[in-house]
UniProtKB/Swiss-Prot annotation:
Residues 152-262 form the FAD-binding FR-type domain. It comes from Rhizobium meliloti (strain 1021). GO terms for molecular function: FAD binding; heme binding; metal ion binding; nitric oxide dioxygenase NAD(P)H activity; oxygen binding; oxygen carrier activity. This is Flavohemoprotein. PANTHER family: FLAVOHEMOPROTEIN (PTHR43396:SF3).
Length: 403
């Protein structure tokens, strides 16, 4: 339990840390990786190079400090972090390592301004946060291991199918190498895939949505190729596209994530996606259309038909289920793409153009796609009168969505 004095010191110094936050976090990662290079196996090094992980951690530290009197207000954020950590295999013994280098970085960047009293207060605050997260993650590991077909840590899977979905998205159907069943998951959850990157000399982990409904035998992930070279974003996705084939092995974590629909509800849902953001939506859609039927509206944006994954199966579903409406936006339609046949609207996704179809009583709204896309859709939904509590979103990688 933190004393009031500790809370007061943390709150009073939070603005100073926010001002120097990026420099502190940059210093922290450099310091920690020099002392513990094995942690590069957990962290996304592409996000490191772009500075996104540094920004996200700096923002998280400040948010925790600013809300230290009312940590319950961060419960949803902490839950998301715990799910992400569980998917990465973060262990309790790694928290002291992070704490040691974070506190040392605060001292080394701020110098004499970071007094012993300030460092002590932040050490207590960090310890409290670490205990909360480690406890949440322990529960997630136990739950994953105890359920039928579940496991904790990494499990070897065999690629049984590799199917191109578009020019840039490929689906992989994966079955356990041990021949056992796989755990069910909530529609919208993700798994982590761990691959060894020989040229880097360490493992890299990426999260991919499970893009099919649970079947107890296999998982399907749909991966967008993010073109890039060594050490840049997209290296892992390119490796999966180019080097992983049927019969090869991949290591998977159990399903995690808080972005999913309530399968017991019958109220309407509106799915809004951009690009590869449709992958969790497809899983949600398949489950929602099962008995009892519920109203579903799917609004999707892509550049054109060449990169529009799973187009035919979505169109088929819209013809089959009377309670399902599909709206497609192409912002760069090909000459062969015909409005009214291949897509409904030219341009970027604009929910105002379909507001008569998406403004439904008691509906929940799910957004997935690039961060700027999600921010735009989120703000437009608020402008249409949708409450914040009804809007849900998924961010893979550092969460740069919330300001």
């Amino acid at each position: 339990m933190l004393t009031q004095k500790t809370k007061d010191i943390v709150k009073a110094t939070a603005p100073v840390l926010a001002q120097h936050g990026y420099a502190i976090i940059q210093h922290f990662y450099k310091r920690m990786f020099q002392a513990h290079p094995e942690l590069k196996n957990i962290f996304n090094m592409a996000h490191q190079e772009r500075g996104e992980q540094q920004q996200a951690l700096a923002r998280a530290v400040y948010a925790y400090a600013a809300n230290i009197e009312n940590p319950e207000s961060l419960s949803a954020v902490l839950k998301d972090i715990a799910h992400k950590h569980a998917s990465l295999g973060v262990r309790p013994e790694q928290y002291p390592i992070v704490g040691e280098h974070l506190l040392a970085s605060i001292k080394e960047v701020l110098g004499d301004a970071a007094t012993d009293e300030i460092i002590s207060a932040w050490a207590q605050a960090y310890g409290n946060l670490a205990d909360i997260l480690a406890g949440m993650e322990s529960e997630l590991y136990e739950r994953s291991e105890e359920r039928a077909g579940g496991w904790a840590g990494w499990r070897r899977f065999i690629v049984r199918e590799k199917n191109p979905e578009s020019d840039v998205i490929t689906s992989f159907v994966l079955e356990p190498a041990d021949g056992g069943p796989v755990a069910d998951f909530e529609p919208g959850q993700y798994t982590s895939v761990a691959v060894q990157v020989p040229k880097l000399g360490y493992q890299q982990i990426r999260q991919y949505s499970l893009s099919d409904s649970p079947n107890g035998r296999s998982y399907r992930i749909s991966v967008k190729r993010e073109d890039g070279g060594l050490g840049t974003p997209g290296y892992v996705s390119s490796l999966l596209h180019d080097e992983i084939n049927v019969g090869d092995e991949l290591k998977l974590a159990a399903p995690y994530g808080n972005f999913y629909i309530d399968v017991s509800a019958t109220t309407p849902i509106v799915l809004i996606s951009g690009g590869v953001g449709l992958t969790p939506m497809v899983s949600m859609l398949k489950k929602a259309l099962q008995t009892p039927p519920r109203k579903v509206v799917f609004v999707h944006g892509a550049r054109n038909s060449a990169v529009h994954a799973m187009r035919d199966r979505l169109k088929e579903a819209s013809r089959t289920y009377p309670d399902f409406k599909l709206f497609i936006f192409y912002d760069e339609p090909l000459p062969t793409d015909i409005e009214g046949r291949d897509y409904d609207f030219a341009g970027l996704v604009d929910v105002e153009k379909v507001k008569d179809s998406i403004l439904l009583d008691d509906a929940d709204y799910y957004i997935c796609g690039p961060v700027p896309f999600m921010r735009m859709q989120h703000d437009k939904l608020l402008g249409l009168g949708i409450t914040e509590a009804r809007i849900h979103y998924e961010v893979f990688g550092p969460d740069l969505f919330a300001e």
